[in-house]
Amino acid sequence: MEYRVEHDTMGEVKVPNDKYWGAQTERSFENFKIGCEKMPKVLIYAFANLKKSLALVNNKLGKLDDAKKNAIVQACDEIIAGKFDDNFPLAIWQTGSGTQSNMNMNEVIANRATEIMGGDFRKEKLVHPNDHVNMSQSSNDTFPTAMSIVAVEQVEKKLIPALDELIATFEKKVKEFDGIIKIGRTHLQDATPLTLAQEFSGYLSMLLHSKEQIIASLPTLRELAIGGTAVGTGLNAHPELSQKVSEELTQLIGTKFISSPNKFHALTSHDAINFTHGAMKGLAANLMKIANDIRWLASGPRCGLGELIIPENEPGSSIMPGKVNPTQCEAVTMVAVQVMGNDVAIGFAASQGNFELNVFKPVIIYNFLQSLDLLADSMHSFNIHCAVGIEPNRAKIDHNLHNSLMLVTALNPHIGYENAAKVAKNAHKKGISLKESTMELGLVSEEDFNKFVDPTKMIGPKA
């Protein structure tokens, strides 16, 4: 491999000749060989959009000439298009401010912009990473701004569409399952009846509420730290920079961003991203419950509850022939566990904003994006490989319904709670039906029993 010599304020550094990064990126690459977690590509692209917006605004403010602005914008567009993905090698486990990733971006843009302007970045710097690309900025305000951009963008473009897809499927299932009466269960024990549509309407409502909660968390996430520079005072930044960059990003990305009204808050706290992830954790909890219920209701096929039939996607056992497992449900529940773990990490990291700067930024955004990707991908997978194919096992549903002792609840208004309990206990002890038990105890006539104990009349309130 051929190398060139780059330099920074600490001296000279050898850098692979085919790479566009510079000295500070190389130092980080060599100093932090920790784990395999790299800066997510979507974060890199959000950062490039930010640098593009800054170049445009600095040009409008008269601080950056047209030639450099045009070259920087083109370099950013190429990064966003994925042409330089292999030039962003840094680990998440680096400085907690994200400074080295900010400089990685600055160096790649500067060297590519120099090339665009006709220069050879290996010999000269027509565009400087600090003086031009990082003009009026600090890592302390650019990295959290990139975090906000990518978080909002991915929630809107990836998470919500995947959630909407699952919501649409459950809306269809509620309609399909209307009129199918089944036994309810509380405490893992038989309870009073409801319809399968009512049960699934609960799942649907949970998903709708999760969507509302996630969307409701976004307004403060749209507040950008840019313009705060090092500690929130805006030192070396034009007073109009923050507002103009927010407007530029809104136009560029197509979703609303605003300048944070308090830059000291924006640099030292990540409560907004913590709040949004909390809503995502709420979605994970709902998905855990829904997937668990569905796999229990589909358990069997002969010795379980067996009230639902789910798609058979692959063999389930390496030793038991013919076994099929609820694998999509299991994947969703594992994702939910991971998201809950990420929430703990994000919450603790967000609490560590010592003085003017939180220095846990990379791990916060990495875990946030991992949770978002896992939730979106698992919902899509669960939907197409399981949810759309869920069918009721009507024979098993009817069998379980009519063998449940909890239908005795319908007798409460007519013979009282204690007598109804005697009917249920007598039936259970002797292995007879509720009707037989009632007749044996002489509490109501057969005609009245048939009138009172009617599952179709037990699925809603009655005056």
Curated annotation (Swiss-Prot):
PROSITE patterns linked: FUMARATE_LYASES
Subunit composition and interactions: Homotetramer.
Recorded catalytic activity of this chain's protein: (S)-malate = fumarate + H2O
InterPro entries per UniProt: Fum_hydII, Fumarase/histidase_N, Fumarase_C_C, Fumarate_lyase_CS, Fumarate_lyase_fam, Fumarate_lyase_N, L-Aspartase-like
Protein name: Fumarate hydratase class II
Principal place of residence: cytoplasm
Binding site for substrate: 97-99, 128-131, 138-140, 186, 318, 323-325
EC number: 4.2.1.2
Molecular function terms, GO-annotated: fumarate hydratase activity
Keyword Lyase included in the entry's annotation: yes
Main EC class the enzyme belongs to: lyase
Site (Important for catalytic activity): E330
Gene3D superfamilies: Fumarase/aspartase (C-terminal domain), Fumarase/aspartase (Central domain), Fumarase/aspartase (N-terminal domain)
UniProt entry keywords in alphabetical sequence: Cytoplasm, Lyase, Tricarboxylic acid cycle
GO terms for biological process, alphabetical: fumarate metabolic process; malate metabolic process; tricarboxylic acid cycle
Gene field: fumC
Homology family: Belongs to the class-II fumarase/aspartase family. Fumarase subfamily.
CDD domains assigned: Fumarase_classII
